[in-house]
Protein backbone atom coordinates (compact mmCIF):
# COMPACT_ATOMS: atom_id res chain seq x y z
CA UNK A 1 0.00 0.00 0.00
CA UNK A 2 1.52 3.31 -1.07
CA UNK A 3 0.35 6.88 -0.89
CA UNK A 4 -0.67 8.76 -4.01
CA UNK A 5 2.53 10.75 -3.74
CA UNK A 6 6.12 9.71 -3.23
CA UNK A 7 8.34 7.16 -4.93
CA UNK A 8 7.08 3.66 -5.56
CA UNK A 9 10.00 1.25 -5.15
CA UNK A 10 12.25 3.82 -3.49
CA UNK A 11 13.82 1.14 -1.28
CA UNK A 12 15.15 -0.60 -4.38
CA UNK A 13 16.12 2.66 -6.04
CA UNK A 14 18.18 3.78 -3.06
CA UNK A 15 19.85 0.39 -2.65
CA UNK A 16 20.31 -0.79 -6.26
CA UNK A 17 20.34 2.46 -8.19
CA UNK A 18 17.26 1.43 -10.16
CA UNK A 19 13.73 0.18 -9.62
CA UNK A 20 13.48 -3.52 -10.57
CA UNK A 21 10.89 -5.28 -12.67
CA UNK A 22 8.75 -7.35 -12.18
CA UNK A 23 9.04 -6.47 -8.50
CA UNK A 24 7.64 -3.00 -9.22
CA UNK A 25 5.34 -2.20 -12.16
CA UNK A 26 6.52 0.45 -14.64
CA UNK A 27 9.96 0.19 -13.02
CA UNK A 28 12.12 1.53 -15.84
CA UNK A 29 9.88 4.54 -16.33
CA UNK A 30 10.04 5.21 -12.59
CA UNK A 31 13.83 4.90 -12.52
CA UNK A 32 14.21 7.42 -15.34
CA UNK A 33 11.75 9.83 -13.78
CA UNK A 34 13.40 9.55 -10.36
CA UNK A 35 16.82 10.23 -11.91
CA UNK A 36 15.53 13.41 -13.53
CA UNK A 37 13.80 14.44 -10.29
CA UNK A 38 17.09 13.88 -8.44
CA UNK A 39 18.83 16.22 -10.86
CA UNK A 40 16.15 18.84 -10.18
CA UNK A 41 16.66 18.41 -6.44
CA UNK A 42 20.41 18.82 -6.94
CA UNK A 43 19.93 22.06 -8.86
CA UNK A 44 17.62 23.40 -6.17
CA UNK A 45 20.01 22.44 -3.38
CA UNK A 46 22.87 24.06 -5.23
CA UNK A 47 20.90 27.29 -5.60
CA UNK A 48 20.47 27.28 -1.81
CA UNK A 49 24.21 26.83 -1.29
CA UNK A 50 23.80 23.28 0.03
CA UNK A 51 26.51 21.71 -2.12
CA UNK A 52 26.76 18.52 -0.05
CA UNK A 53 23.12 17.72 -0.78
CA UNK A 54 23.52 18.80 -4.40
CA UNK A 55 26.47 16.46 -4.89
CA UNK A 56 24.51 13.55 -3.42
CA UNK A 57 21.61 14.10 -5.80
CA UNK A 58 23.77 14.80 -8.84
CA UNK A 59 25.23 11.35 -8.28
CA UNK A 60 21.76 9.78 -7.97
CA UNK A 61 20.74 11.57 -11.17
CA UNK A 62 23.14 9.26 -12.99
CA UNK A 63 21.06 6.21 -12.06
CA UNK A 64 19.52 6.23 -15.54
CA UNK A 65 22.77 4.63 -16.71
CA UNK A 66 21.94 1.47 -14.76
CA UNK A 67 19.13 0.53 -17.15
CA UNK A 68 20.83 1.24 -20.48
CA UNK A 69 21.24 -2.11 -22.21
CA UNK A 70 24.37 -1.72 -24.37
CA UNK A 71 23.80 -4.96 -26.24
CA UNK A 72 20.64 -3.50 -27.76
CA UNK A 73 21.22 0.24 -27.43
CA UNK A 74 17.99 0.92 -25.54
CA UNK A 75 16.75 1.40 -22.01
CA UNK A 76 15.44 -1.92 -20.72
CA UNK A 77 14.84 -3.46 -17.31
CA UNK A 78 16.49 -5.59 -14.64
CA UNK A 79 15.15 -7.64 -11.79
CA UNK A 80 16.20 -7.15 -8.18
CA UNK A 81 19.12 -9.55 -8.68
CA UNK A 82 20.55 -7.44 -11.48
CA UNK A 83 19.53 -9.72 -14.34
CA UNK A 84 18.39 -8.16 -17.59
CA UNK A 85 14.88 -9.18 -18.52
CA UNK A 86 15.05 -11.70 -21.37
CA UNK A 87 13.23 -11.52 -24.71
CA UNK A 88 14.18 -7.93 -25.45
CA UNK A 89 11.49 -6.23 -27.53
CA UNK A 90 11.80 -2.48 -28.14
CA UNK A 91 8.18 -2.38 -29.36
CA UNK A 92 6.67 -3.82 -26.16
CA UNK A 93 4.44 -1.39 -24.30
CA UNK A 94 3.64 -1.51 -20.60
CA UNK A 95 5.45 -3.84 -18.23
CA UNK A 96 8.48 -1.82 -17.09
CA UNK A 97 7.27 1.23 -19.02
CA UNK A 98 4.37 3.67 -18.65
CA UNK A 99 2.22 4.24 -21.73
CA UNK A 100 5.16 3.65 -24.02
CA UNK A 101 7.94 1.30 -25.03
CA UNK A 102 11.71 1.20 -24.97
CA UNK A 103 11.69 3.24 -28.19
CA UNK A 104 10.17 6.13 -26.25
CA UNK A 105 11.62 5.85 -22.77
CA UNK A 106 15.20 5.49 -23.99
CA UNK A 107 15.20 9.24 -24.63
CA UNK A 108 13.86 10.17 -21.18
CA UNK A 109 17.17 11.56 -19.93
CA UNK A 110 16.24 15.24 -20.09
CA UNK A 111 19.01 16.34 -17.75
CA UNK A 112 21.97 14.61 -19.39
CA UNK A 113 21.76 14.23 -23.18
CA UNK A 114 25.54 14.17 -23.41
CA UNK A 115 25.67 11.27 -20.95
CA UNK A 116 23.06 9.40 -22.98
CA UNK A 117 25.08 10.09 -26.11
CA UNK A 118 28.17 8.63 -24.44
CA UNK A 119 26.25 5.47 -23.57
CA UNK A 120 25.22 5.16 -27.21
CA UNK A 121 28.80 5.57 -28.40
CA UNK A 122 28.79 9.27 -29.30
CA UNK A 123 26.81 11.72 -31.38
CA UNK A 124 26.96 9.73 -34.61
CA UNK A 125 25.37 6.56 -33.16
CA UNK A 126 22.85 8.74 -31.32
CA UNK A 127 21.82 10.36 -34.60
CA UNK A 128 21.51 6.92 -36.17
CA UNK A 129 19.24 5.76 -33.34
CA UNK A 130 17.10 8.88 -33.64
CA UNK A 131 16.89 8.47 -37.41
CA UNK A 132 15.84 4.85 -37.02
CA UNK A 133 12.99 5.79 -34.67
CA UNK A 134 11.32 7.86 -37.39
CA UNK A 135 11.60 5.22 -40.12
CA UNK A 136 11.07 1.99 -38.16
CA UNK A 137 7.77 0.19 -38.83
CA UNK A 138 5.15 1.49 -36.40
CA UNK A 139 4.35 -2.01 -35.24
CA UNK A 140 3.73 -2.65 -31.55
CA UNK A 141 3.40 -5.29 -28.89
CA UNK A 142 0.73 -4.09 -26.46
CA UNK A 143 2.39 -6.14 -23.73
CA UNK A 144 0.88 -6.10 -20.26
CA UNK A 145 -1.88 -3.73 -21.31
CA UNK A 146 -3.57 -6.58 -23.14
CA UNK A 147 -5.22 -4.25 -25.65
CA UNK A 148 -4.46 -1.21 -27.80
CA UNK A 149 -4.38 1.81 -25.49
CA UNK A 150 -5.01 5.23 -27.01
CA UNK A 151 -1.31 6.15 -27.04
CA UNK A 152 -0.61 3.14 -29.27
CA UNK A 153 -3.46 4.06 -31.61
CA UNK A 154 -2.16 7.63 -31.77
CA UNK A 155 1.36 6.48 -32.64
CA UNK A 156 0.04 4.31 -35.46
CA UNK A 157 -2.18 7.12 -36.78
CA UNK A 158 0.70 9.63 -36.68
CA UNK A 159 2.71 7.31 -38.93
CA UNK A 160 6.13 8.64 -37.97
CA UNK A 161 7.75 5.29 -37.29
CA UNK A 162 8.11 4.54 -33.59
CA UNK A 163 7.86 8.20 -32.61
CA UNK A 164 4.83 8.61 -30.32
CA UNK A 165 4.05 12.29 -29.89
CA UNK A 166 1.08 11.40 -27.70
CA UNK A 167 3.32 10.53 -24.75
CA UNK A 168 5.63 12.92 -22.93
CA UNK A 169 8.87 10.89 -22.54
CA UNK A 170 9.66 11.18 -26.26
CA UNK A 171 8.23 14.56 -27.24
CA UNK A 172 11.57 16.31 -26.73
CA UNK A 173 13.53 13.79 -28.82
CA UNK A 174 13.06 15.80 -32.01
CA UNK A 175 15.04 18.65 -30.41
CA UNK A 176 18.00 16.38 -29.69
CA UNK A 177 19.05 16.83 -33.31
CA UNK A 178 19.72 20.50 -32.45
CA UNK A 179 21.92 19.41 -29.57
CA UNK A 180 24.00 17.00 -31.64
CA UNK A 181 24.53 19.21 -34.65
CA UNK A 182 21.81 18.33 -37.18
CA UNK A 183 19.18 21.05 -36.66
CA UNK A 184 17.64 20.58 -40.11
CA UNK A 185 16.27 17.23 -38.91
CA UNK A 186 14.60 18.98 -35.97
CA UNK A 187 13.00 21.39 -38.43
CA UNK A 188 11.85 18.58 -40.72
CA UNK A 189 10.25 16.44 -38.00
CA UNK A 190 8.73 19.41 -36.18
CA UNK A 191 7.05 20.58 -39.36
CA UNK A 192 5.71 17.06 -39.88
CA UNK A 193 4.26 17.00 -36.34
CA UNK A 194 2.81 20.50 -36.69
CA UNK A 195 1.17 19.70 -40.01
CA UNK A 196 -0.31 16.43 -38.76
CA UNK A 197 -1.39 17.30 -35.23
CA UNK A 198 -1.89 21.04 -34.83
CA UNK A 199 -3.91 23.80 -36.45
CA UNK A 200 -4.90 27.38 -35.74
CA UNK A 201 -8.16 26.33 -34.06
Identify the residue ranges that each predicted region occupies.
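Active-site core of glycosidic bond-cleaving carbohydrate-active enzymes
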Residues: 1-62, 66-201
Amino acid sequence: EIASVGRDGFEYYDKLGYVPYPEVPEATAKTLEYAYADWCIARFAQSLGKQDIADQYYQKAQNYRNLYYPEHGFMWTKDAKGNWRDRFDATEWGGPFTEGSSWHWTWSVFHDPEGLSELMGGHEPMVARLDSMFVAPNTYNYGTYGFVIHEIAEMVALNMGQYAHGNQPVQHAIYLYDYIGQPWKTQYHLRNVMDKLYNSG
